[in-house]
Amino acid sequence: MHLSLLTGAVGCAGTRAALQPSTPPATDAAPAAIVPPKDAHVHALVAADASGTQDYVCSPVTGHDGSFAWTLRGPDAVLFGAQGAQLGRHFAGPTWEWSDGSAIVGALAAKADAPDPADIPWLLLSVKEHKGAGGALAPVRFVQRLATKGGKAPADGCDGDHANQVARVPYSAHYVFLGS
């Protein structure tokens, strides 16, 4: 049986308002660990705020008989522009898909702890695949995840009795798309 569990103090309907990042930091304010290399010659092309969930599944731990842990299945979020218009969505891959049909798939390049230990880390992802012809995401080479709120795996509730259970943890973040 596949069960779903929504964790956190906010239900899905209120996630965007309650978890909206405060004034997102500028790209140059990102920790040095998640700034693209200077020889990449990239700059910020566009930014978006994400609001949704980080989804985890309760899975057996390989090599540890009887142990279970929350494993990231992926994000499920809507991307919004500065004026609140929906720009696209963000889902497992990790993939960002724009409303114009362009999409990118990222790979972890670097990470830094969020200022609040209760929040998921800030990331630098390199683009490993472009999908769709042209579009807003076509020139993107890196993505920064900044100003995260929430999204961490539950601290407990994952054991043999809860195998395959899904925890949908509310989160928000500010994504900066970098290219040339």
Question: Where in this protein do the model-derived segments appear?
Answer:
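Bacterial signal peptide processing site
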Residues: 13-15
